[in-house]
Amino acid sequence: MTDQSHQCVIIGIAGASASGKSLIASTLYRELREQVGDEHIGVIPEDSYYKDQSHLSMEERVKTNYDHPNAMDHSLLFQHLQALKRGSAIELPVYSYVEHTRMQETVRVEPKKVIILEGILLLTDARLREEMNFSIFVDTPLDICLMRRIKRDVNERGRSMDSVMAQYQKTVRPMFLQFIEPSKQYADIIVPCGGKNRIAIDILKAKISQFFE
């Protein structure tokens, strides 16, 4: 990586759906922001880069396999990471879990010293891995992930338990075994026990803090 004053550091956090990725990312962001300030660190969720499906009917949208790499616009994410590294702002897409598509509005993200990426499929794409300074895989047992996913999708995303279970059996678990779990081999750090692993979070904080020196 070129040593430039505006050059941002990219940290990837991957793992199964509901493994604790977002909790680790938000904890690192919150605690490091208190140390260095909001202008120096940010979080980008891979979910924002689900492909636009506005041209499809709602019936077609709900049939999309959202756990397959083809559901993601990784090309746009790759372009945005390169732009941030050049010191340019990006327009972050906004994805609606209710409408199952990308919204028209975007959120402007300014370059930061450290950007934390989090998402299930980040490590499946070699282009994204090349942009990361280091990567983390959150290794949580699938039965725990399923319980968390049911609670989250029913309470926060308006899903029925039957629909969550059907999706899990049809796509979530098979795609985890086919794509996500094998991508663990590319991680620099593997974190067991999900987002409440305080020892792992403290180690990651110490590692990331080095980039602010």
UniProtKB/Swiss-Prot annotation:
Its main location: cytoplasm. GO terms for biological process: CTP salvage; UMP salvage. It is found in: Cytoplasm. Disulfide bonds: none annotated. It comes from the Bacteria. The keyword Transferase applies. Pathway: Pyrimidine metabolism; CTP biosynthesis via salvage pathway; CTP from cytidine: step 1/3; Pyrimidine metabolism; UMP biosynthesis via salvage pathway; UMP from uridine: step 1/1. ATP binds at G15, A16, S17, A18, S19, G20, K21, S22. Its EC number is 2.7.1.48. InterPro entries: P-loop_NTPase, PRK/URK, Uridine_kinase, Uridine_kinase-like. Keywords: ATP-binding, Cytoplasm, Kinase, Nucleotide-binding, Transferase. One of its GO terms (cellular component) is cytoplasm. Transmembrane segments: none annotated. CDD domains: UMPK (cd02023). It catalyses: uridine + ATP = UMP + ADP + H(+); cytidine + ATP = CMP + ADP + H(+). One of its GO terms (molecular function) is cytidine kinase activity. It is an enzyme of class 2 (transferase). NCBIfam families: PRK05480.1, udk. Belongs to the uridine kinase family. This is Uridine kinase. The gene is udk.
